[in-house]
Amino acid sequence: MAALYPALTPEQKKELAEIAQRIVSNGKGILAADESTGTMGKRLSAIKVENVDENRRVYRQLLFSSDPSVTKAIGGVIFYEETLYQKTDDGTPFVKLIKDRGIVVGIKVDKGTVPLAGTDGESTTQGLDGLAERCARYKKDGADFAKWRCVLKISKNTPSALAIAENANVLARYASICQQNGLVPIVEPEILPDGDHDLKTCQYVTEKVLAATYKALSDHHVYLEGSLLKPNMVTAGQASKIRCSPQEVAMATVTALRRTVPSAVPGITFLSGGQSEEDASLNLNAINQLPLERPWALSFSYGRALQASVLKAWAGAPANIPAAKKEFEKRAAINGLAAQGKYVPAGSSGSAASESLFIANHNY
């Protein structure tokens, strides 16, 4: 066996561990506001708003300038590169606005998925070229964590062993590069909800993917205490005729995590995966009420499940901004409670919160 060459200094490890803990402490989670320009275009066109720089800036300003009470539930915000350099109406950089509230700034660093040759329509994620230089710049410009998404799907022939191994290795390379540059890596091996598979199949595949991911992270000497995991919840496929209860989703999800994720990882921040806002909150709540030992913080890193109602309330009108902020504050508070297993639904959650947010072969 090769000699052990320490990759990170004790000071680097301490900083990374402290950042990771801050993001997920006391029921806090992450607002994923890292939609690419193309994805924001789809979101804005749904409310008949033009996809231009200023409209994207105004919308993100709406989210970032909500009532300070959201800091009880939001520990981190993931930016898209464009957002990292945008400012509020009065000239305050978004990065300063967020950091002044005690929220950690993150940045999406991958360059999207590309086809993986020799597979049945599977993909890998690009963006490793120049990543070290970009991470160093983002750290200097105020970011303290990063996100990289890999995508796998369940079908008769997928995920293949090749796709699992390739994506695990890419995630590990990314995580190692981030840590060398002072950024906490969020590792996101998303298994898409597309398909008619049952809960048991999703659990099996999730376990295989996470086991491969953590083997790769070990091979690449990634410091787990200074990292976070962003997995899918274990659910039946979107086209499955069987609808699972939050308790069934919780048991399958936590069982898969207990079998594969080392307890050194400080936090697991679930993606919403096209669930409705309310389903994402109910499932997270059930996960945190499960009578099984859970050595990690189990929280959220939601994009659509924190923003769908906000977008509808805003609809691009300046007069609607206060109402839209209220919607965001409400969803943030609900998920902050769910991350502690303390969410008690109060009857009807409103039509927008109950709408499925599923998008086939979702890409952003």
From Swiss-Prot:
Entry coiled-coil feature ranges: none
Entry annotation: catalytic residues: 230
Gene3D superfamilies recorded: Aldolase class I
Group of enzyme by EC: lyase
Residues annotated as site: Necessary for preference for fructose 1,6-bisphosphate over fructose 1-phosphate: 364
Pathway(s): Carbohydrate degradation; glycolysis; D-glyceraldehyde 3-phosphate and glycerone phosphate from D-glucose: step 4/4
Tissue expression per record: Expressed mainly in the liver and also in brain and other tissues, except for the heart muscle.
Superkingdom, natural source: Eukaryota
Catalysis: reaction(s): beta-D-fructose 1,6-bisphosphate = D-glyceraldehyde 3-phosphate + dihydroxyacetone phosphate
PROSITE patterns documented for this protein: ALDOLASE_CLASS_I
Record GO biological process: glycolytic process
CDD domains xref list: FBP_aldolase_I_a
UniProt keyword annotations, A-Z: Glycolysis, Lyase, Schiff base
InterPro entries hit by this protein: Aldolase_I_AS (IPR029768), Aldolase_TIM (IPR013785), FBA_I (IPR000741)
Binding site for substrate: 56, 147
EC number(s) stated in the UniProt entry for this protein: 4.1.2.13
Subunit (UniProt): Homotetramer.
PANTHER family the record matches: FRUCTOSE-BISPHOSPHATE ALDOLASE
Protein name (database record): Fructose-bisphosphate aldolase, non-muscle type
